[in-house]
């Protein structure tokens, strides 16, 4: 799907705000060392898919922590953004880092 510049700005704004909230406002240790890799906000801004990465061993822990903290993150996000609607947050694991590591490992083995 093609994104316009305003859509990219909205997605980046959402990513920056959520990353800041995790860094400064959420004290759950299970959400430490989590990286927000991207956001996709729907056209009407009612839904925001939030992509994150974490260590493989912590996938389930982090998913549960996001489920518990999503309401708090949403309310803090609504305060910081001047959008009419606070979007529903859907946290999704970004497996692109895992894929990149797997490819790099395969290339390293082949080169050796």
Annotate each language-model stretch with its function:
Residues 1-49, 53-112:
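Charge-rich, low-complexity N-terminal segments
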């Amino acid at each position: 799907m093609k994104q316009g510049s305003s859509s990219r700005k909205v997605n980046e704004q959402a990513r920056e705000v959520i990353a800041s909230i995790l860094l400064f406002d959420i004290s759950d240790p299970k959400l430490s060392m989590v990286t927000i890799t991207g956001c996709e906000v729907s056209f009407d801004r009612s839904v925001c898919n939030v992509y994150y990465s974490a260590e493989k061993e912590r996938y389930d822990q982090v998913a549960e922590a996001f489920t518990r903290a999503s309401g708090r993150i949403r309310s803090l996000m609504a305060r910081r953004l001047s959008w009419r609607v606070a979007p529903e947050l859907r946290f999704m694991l970004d497996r692109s880092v895992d894929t990149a590591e797997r490819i790099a490992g395969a290339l390293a083995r082949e080169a050796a």
